[in-house]
């Protein structure tokens, strides 16, 4: 219901036209729920994967949850957890989550990825290299 109302506004048409070409875009002035609704409508219209940059991981998680509620498949790409000194035991949960999100993204299973700015600034493996090292298991 809200999406159909939104799609008939002049502002939506301008934003949709600007996103039809490659490159970044920024949106300011809407509350988070309004941005999520707008991004979900744009993704459904344009069929492109959204990369939404947020200030932190909490905001990325909330945004991904909002997008999931609007019918998109979304994931949070967490920042890498650095250990600056030796520790007895270190969990690898964040690395596993990062690899899982990269795999879903490379496999075309995501409509949107929510990325904290910290994670966006960290290096990751190039797509071709990542796909070369994947193993597909059929069950």
Model-assigned labels for residue ranges:
Residues 1-138:
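ASCE RecA-like P-loop NTPase motor cores
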